[in-house]
Swiss-Prot record:
Disulphide connectivity of cysteines: 26-34, 36-48, 42-57
Protein name: Hirudin-HM2
Signal peptide, first to last residue: 1-20
Keywords: Disulfide bond, Glycoprotein, Protease inhibitor, Secreted, Serine protease inhibitor, Signal
Principal location class: secreted
């Protein structure tokens, strides 16, 4: 019984590890994809450039990260407009 539990735990760990996404170091030519939103993994003074084909590491400014939403970003809608 203990061996079965151990096997199930081992199997679950293997599945989780195999599904993990790994990002490689970005190269000088910027052809490797890189994580941009949330954290910057480009390194070596490079920044992420967002594009529809994927995120690439580039020298320079890159694409600014989206600012987080705050309460002041939205206009309040009066209750009577919602109910009508």
């Amino acid at each position: 019984m203990f061996s079965l539990k151990l096997f199930v735990v081992f199997l679950a760990v293997c599945i989780c590890v195999s599904q993990a996404v790994s990002y490689t170091d970005c190269t000088e030519s910027g052809q490797n994809y890189c994580l941009c939103v949330g954290s910057n993994v480009c390194g070596e003074g490079k920044n992420c450039q967002l594009s529809s084909s994927g995120n690439q590491c580039v020298h320079g400014e890159g694409t600014p990260k989206p600012k987080s939403q705050t309460e002041g970003d939205f206009e309040e809608i009066p209750d009577e407009d919602i109910l009508n």
